[in-house]
Amino acid sequence: MVRQMLIFDMDGTLTDPVQVINNDVKDILRRCKRKNFEIAVVSGSKYEKIKGQLNDGFIDEFDYVFSENGTQVYVKNVLVKSLDITEAIPETKLRKMVEFCLRYIADLDIPTKRGTFIEHRKSLINICPPGRNCSMVDRRRFVEYDSIHHVRQKLIQVLKSQFDSDDCPLSFVAGGQISIDVYPKAWSKSIALSHIGKCDVIHFFGDNTREGGNDFEIYNHPDVIGHTVTGYKDLVNQLEELLAKS
């Protein structure tokens, strides 16, 4: 039997940003499974956040859950593989980067600052100029402001010039709507592909597929058929087309 897999980004793809999964998405994913597609989700978020968005136990219907870009691998709620950023980047470099970002954000003139500007996850550093504690209203204000003033892209360029190096190559990418993710260059979302074994056909669906976005590498991987989506409704439409051809 041909082994086929569908891999999905979370925010902006399976769900609206930081919202729970819609029943229409659940229904079509179940139809995909009945057509013998395996399904997986890969997100920069922590596992607990992914689990909360895939509510009512729906996470159990995924064959793989790849949190933190695929460096934390879960199969049926069991962690089977984990990478730690502190084992890949020297502590002195991590500390200097965090201190630099806090000073940089302190001097930013942006609509709101709400706290939790730096989040140290197991395998990546999440930098959030408005703060991860921001409300949905705050989030929308920053998204609009960032689309005009390019706050994140400017910070990304500064971080690249300050902290990327040949001896410790790092990726600095736009994550979701309001953040920047920092991780070793080899730990993009495409690392998830190394955990699924031999697969005949792999489709990836994501919204942040442009260069500089955190879906770019897996979307452009030679073993992957990449699909750019504009939201969960567009995802449903694209999956309907895929099922019609299956």
From Swiss-Prot:
Instruction: List GO BP terms, alphabetically.
Output: GDP-mannose biosynthetic process; mannose metabolic process; protein N-linked glycosylation
Q: Which GO terms describe its molecular function?
A: metal ion binding; phosphomannomutase activity
Q: Which domain of life is it from?
A: Eukaryota
Record pathway: Nucleotide-sugar biosynthesis; GDP-alpha-D-mannose biosynthesis; alpha-D-mannose 1-phosphate from D-fructose 6-phosphate: step 2/2
A Pfam family this chain is assigned to: PMM
Provide the E.C. number(s) assigned to this enzyme.
5.4.2.8
Q: Does the keyword Zinc apply?
A: no
Q: Which UniProt keywords apply?
A: Cytoplasm, Isomerase, Magnesium, Metal-binding
Task: Give the record's GO CC terms.
Answer: cytosol
Do you know which InterPro entries this protein is assigned to?
HAD-like_sf, HAD-SF_hydro_IIB, HAD_sf, PMM, PMM_cap
For the keyword Magnesium, the answer is: yes
Q: Which residues form the active site?
A: D9, D11
Please tell me where this protein is predominantly located.
Answer: cytoplasm
Report residues binding Mg(2+): D9, D11, D207
Give the reaction(s) catalysed. Answer: alpha-D-mannose 1-phosphate = D-mannose 6-phosphate
Subcellular localization, per the record? Cytoplasm
Chain sites annotated for binding alpha-D-mannose 1-phosphate: R121, R132, R139, S179, D181
**Record's function text:** Involved in the synthesis of the GDP-mannose and dolichol-phosphate-mannose required for a number of critical mannosyl transfer reactions.
Q: Which family does it belong to?
A: Belongs to the eukaryotic PMM family.
Subunit structure, briefly?
Homodimer.
- Protein name from the UniProt record: Phosphomannomutase
Origin organism is: Babesia bovis
